[in-house]
């Protein structure tokens, strides 16, 4: 293998499950000392490829080569022993064990048949120092932040001398400071000659970090951009979705009616100060603020998931009393929660059940018999209207992509007489094509006169969608801007948000 030869290469990789071809003829290469991004819509095949690389799946076709030699892994330990580590969104660590024990889990040093804790602490400390971390290796993992857990996963990979480290949506649960630290570590790993495979929907991260980008679509290889000077946002999006989305937000002003939702000095658990705001019929109002600003807590209170503790909420000028989500739904107030998997869907139930779970009460025969035909027709109507990608309405919702799960939740509320919809991080973890479709649904709801209140930590999204932006800081409203007047600088100034200097972190 010459100095210019790829360290890692995929040759005709295919993967089939019963009735589904997840990957077909994937071929591309990665070089040592390279951050190589993998991009594509949900379901494009990125995670499947990582699971093949890590030994979770066996390929149905093709070969993986490392340093020019074919390799085949039967399990994740085989892959780790060959220097391949995957850092998933759901971190695979043991909370009750110490940091040191987690780093060397499966290869604890022994002396006279017993664990050598002195050597274990020493070796773990070296790995943590390598990453620039000041963490006591004797600390139980459960006391660390998610960002620190992730660093322990990286230290675990380095303890096995991993030369190939893949990250799957690594920043989805991190603070700005933790993201900055992660980028510093990733660029340091690159400088040591390691290959970094990086999967993310966040394009600003991809452009800040990557040396090359490979795009997947529908389980197939599309292209590799290996000259970052020749790729921009538009060309990358077009490669991912197979079409030019143009202005992804597609904002157009629309007439607004009377005040539909009004908050007067409202407080809820987790909201530190009183909140006053209003949303008109057909208006889209965006809530922006730091993590901890109280946006999600406010929405939970309005939906009855928690209790409004003071102040007054009005719906169409009349007091809105909500003691439970059922109360909210019956009065036309719906919520798409931030954590859709935990709070928005019933994972082991079908798409049909998840769409109909709220409206079922309206279709019961004789007050207690489920009307299967009505539910099938209603589910089919929502699946068609929202372009929900599913083999059938009987598919378990847990098997759908994040974007399609979100559309199922929206379809559930379309079955109700909606007056207000509360959207908490509506596109988090969703690919750009699905985002475009969800934005279209939001505009359609507003065009029907529904009041839309959405919270998002994606500032371009807030700027692109909202007729009006309300900025929250530490549980209080710090300012308000109209769409025409809003800029990134103005919003961040009101939020007192320190912009992470991504470029300096990766320099």
UniProtKB/Swiss-Prot annotation:
What keywords are annotated for this sequence in UniProt? ATP-binding, Cell inner membrane, Cell membrane, Membrane, Nucleotide-binding, Repeat, Sugar transport, Translocase, Transport
In terms of InterPro entries, this protein maps to: AAA+_ATPase, ABC_carbohydrate_import_ATPase, ABC_transporter-like_ATP-bd, ABC_transporter-like_CS, P-loop_NTPase
Membrane topology field: Peripheral membrane protein
Report residues binding ATP. Answer: 40-47
Q: Where in this chain does the entry annotate a coiled-coil region?
A: none
Q: Which SMART domains match?
A: AAA
Q: Could you tell me which residue ranges the ABC transporter domain spans?
A: 8-243, 255-499
Reaction equations catalysed: L-arabinose(out) + ATP + H2O = L-arabinose(in) + ADP + phosphate + H(+)
Tell me the compartments it is located in.
Cell inner membrane
Q: Name one GO cellular component term.
A: plasma membrane
Q: What is its main location?
A: membrane
Gene Ontology MF terms? ABC-type L-arabinose transporter activity; ATP binding; ATP hydrolysis activity
Q: Which domain of life is it from?
A: Bacteria
Q: Which Gene3D superfamilies match?
A: P-loop containing nucleotide triphosphate hydrolases (3.40.50.300)
Reported EC number(s) for this entry are 7.5.2.12
Please name the NCBIfam families in this protein's record.
PRK11288.1 (NF008442)
- Record's family? Belongs to the ABC transporter superfamily. Arabinose importer (TC 3.A.1.2.2) family.
Q: How does it assemble?
A: The complex is composed of two ATP-binding proteins (AraG), two transmembrane proteins (AraH) and a solute-binding protein (AraF).
The record's function comment reads: Part of the ABC transporter complex AraFGH involved in arabinose import. Responsible for energy coupling to the transport system.
Q: Can you name this protein?
A: Arabinose import ATP-binding protein AraG
Query: Organism classification, top ranks?
Result: Bacteria, Pseudomonadati, Pseudomonadota, Gammaproteobacteria, Enterobacterales
């Amino acid at each position: 293998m010459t100095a210019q030869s790829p360290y890692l290469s995929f040759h005709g990789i295919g993967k089939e499950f019963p009735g589904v071809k997840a990957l077909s003829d994937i071929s591309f290469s990665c070089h040592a000392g390279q951050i190589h991004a993998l991009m594509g819509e949900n379901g494009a095949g990125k995670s499947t490829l990582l699971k093949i690389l890590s030994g979770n799946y066996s390929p149905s076709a093709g070969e993986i080569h490392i340093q020019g030699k074919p390799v085949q892994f039967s399990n994740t330990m085989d892959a780790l022993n060959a220097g391949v580590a995957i850092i998933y969104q759901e971190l695979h660590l043991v909370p009750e064990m110490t940091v040191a024990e987690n780093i060397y889990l499966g290869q604890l040093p022994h002396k006279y048949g017993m664990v050598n804790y002195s050597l274990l602490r020493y070796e773990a400390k070296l790995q943590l120092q390598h990453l620039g971390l000041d963490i006591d290796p004797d600390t139980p993992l459960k006391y660390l932040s998610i960002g620190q857990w992730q660093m322990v996963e990286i230290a675990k990979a380095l303890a096995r001398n991993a030369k190939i480290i893949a990250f799957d949506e690594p920043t989805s649960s991190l603070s700005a400071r933790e993201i900055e630290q992660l980028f510093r570590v990733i660029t340091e790993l690159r400088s040591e000659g390691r290959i970094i495979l990086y999967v993310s929907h966040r394009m600003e991260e991809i452009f800040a970090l990557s040396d090359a980008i490979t795009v997947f679509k529908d389980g197939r290889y599309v292209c590799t951009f290996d000259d970052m000077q020749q790729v921009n946002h538009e060309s990358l999006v077009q490669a991912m979705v197979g079409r030019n989305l143009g202005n992804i937000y597609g904002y157009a002003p629309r007439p607004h009616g009377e005040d539909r939702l009004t908050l007067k000095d409202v407080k809820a658990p987790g909201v530190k100060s009183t909140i006053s705001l209003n949303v008109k019929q057909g208006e889209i109002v965006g809530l922006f603020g730091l993590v901890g600003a109280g946006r999600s807590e406010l929405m939970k209170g309005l939906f009855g998931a928690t209790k409004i503790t003071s102040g007054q909420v009005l719906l169409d000028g009349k007091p809105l009393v909500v003691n439970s989500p059922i109360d909210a739904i019956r009065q036309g107030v719906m919520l798409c929660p931030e954590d859709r998997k935990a709070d928005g869907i019933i994972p082991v139930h079908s798409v049909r059940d998840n769409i109909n779970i709220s409206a079922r009460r309206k279709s019961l025969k004789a007050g207690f018999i489920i009307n299967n035909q009505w539910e099938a027709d209603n589910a089919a109507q929502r699946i068609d209207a929202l372009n929900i990608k599913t083999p059938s309405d009987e598919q378990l919702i847990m098997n759908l992509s994040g974007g399609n799960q979100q559309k199922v939740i929206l379809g559930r509320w379309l079955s109700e007489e909606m007056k207000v919809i509360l959207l908490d991080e509506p596109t988090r973890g969703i690919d750009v094509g699905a985002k475009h479709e969800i934005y279209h649904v939001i505009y359609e709801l507003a065009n029907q006169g529904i009041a839309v209140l959405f919270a998002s930590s994606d500032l371009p999204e807030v700027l692109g969608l909202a007729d009006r932006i309300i900025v929250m800081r530490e549980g209080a409203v710090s300012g308000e801007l109209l769409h025409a007047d809003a800029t990134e600088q103005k919003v961040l100034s009101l939020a007192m948000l320190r912009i992470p200097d991504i470029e300096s972190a990766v320099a």
